[in-house]
Amino acid sequence: MKNLTLENIARVCGGTYYGPADKLQEEVMSVITDSRKAEEGCLFVPIVGERVDAHKFIPQVMEAGALATLSERVLDNADFPYIAVESSLQAVKDIAEFYLKQLQIPVVGIT
């Protein structure tokens, strides 16, 4: 994965960073939406679905070594870095668009 820092991600998705200032320059190693795939250095994107609100998995993901998480709400008493966003789904779209532009490769759509 090309280098994306928490600071870049917060800026790109219009989010507000909460957490230690020294973590802002930490690089995200992967982006996940499935809490079962949490790994060291990942960014968790909790999606609110019809049946499950993935925000409830944030504690387990952080315990598994995630670097940070996005959240559609302010997390009181959080002792880990997170980026508050209006919509996790829109934020991950914004991050993906920014990431693709960094790669400077042609993108082809097949219909």
Question: Where are the regions that the model predicts?
Answer:
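Walker A (P-loop) phosphate-binding motif
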Residues: 96-111
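N-terminal leader/targeting and accessory segments in enzymes
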Residues: 1-98
